[in-house]
Regions:
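A Rossmann-like FAD-binding core segment of flavoenzymes
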Residues: 1, 5-44, 57-67, 71, ...
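Short amphipathic alpha-helical segments
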Residues: 46-50, 88-90, 113
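Rossmann-like NAD(P)H-binding beta-loop-alpha module
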Residues: 69-96
Length: 166
C-alpha cells in the first residue's frame, strides 16, 4: 500500500459503491480511474456431473478453514486464478504431496507472481484441459484445441480420467 501511495494512487478501502457514492462521483472528484476489487467470497458451481461428490470441495470454503478438510495426498485444482493458487499452496502446506492445477486454455487469471509462488511451493500446472465431469477417482478432462493465439477453438475426441483424492 505504501508503494501505491508513493505513486500518487489514492486508496478508499471498504467503500460501498452504488448506495450514497457512485463511480460517477469518484470520477467527478478527480479520480482518473476506479478499481473495484470485490474478491471471491462465493463458491461458483462448475455445472458438471460429480461436483457434489464427497471428494469435491469449493476452494473458498477450503481457504476459510483448511484444517476442517482431509484432502488426501493427491489434489486436483480446477482453474488457475489467484484463489486457485492460494488453494494449491495451502493444500501443499497442509499435507498434500502432489497438487496439480488444470486450465482449459493457456491464458490464466492469476497474476504472474501468484503463479510463481505456487510453483515454488510445488504446484504443477497442466494447460489445455477442460473439465467434463468428476468421479470418485478424480476429474475427467477433454483436451482443448487452441489456435496460434492460444484461444480454445474446440476439443479433441475422447476423455482423460486423472486420479486425485480431492
Amino acid at each position: 500500500q505504501k508503494k501505491l501511495l508513493e505513486l500518487g494512487i489514492r486508496i478508499r478501502p471498504n467503500t460501498a459503491i452504488g448506495t450514497t457514492l457512485t463511480i460517477e462521483d469518484l470520477l467527478r472528484d478527480g479520480y482518473a480511474s476506479v478499481f473495484v476489487g470485490t474478491g471471491v467470497w462465493k463458491a461458483r458451481n462448475l455445472g458438471i456431473p460429480g461436483e457434489c461428490l464427497s471428494n469435491v470441495h469449493f476452494g473458498i470454503d477450503y481457504l476459510a478453514n483448511p484444517s476442517a478438510y482431509s484432502l488426501g495426498e493427491k489434489v486436483a485444482v480446477i482453474g488457475m486464478g489467484n484463489a486457485a493458487m492460494d488453494v494449491a499452496r495451502t493444500a501443499l502446506r497442509n499435507g498434500a504431496h502432489q497438487v496439480t492445477m488444470y486450465a482449459r486454455g493457456r491464458r490464466i487469471a492469476a497474476s504472474s507472481h501468484e503463479m510463481a509462488y505456487a510453483e515454488l511451493d510445488g504446484a504443477e500446472f497442466v494447460f489445455g484441459k477442460a473439465i467434463e465431469r468428476i468421479t470418485e477417482k478424480g476429474p475427467v478432462f477433454k483436451t482443448s484445441i487452441m489456435d496460434e493465439n492460444n484461444r480454445v477453438t474446440g476439443y479433441e475426441e475422447g476423455e482423460e480420467q486423472t486420479e486425485a483424492d480431492s
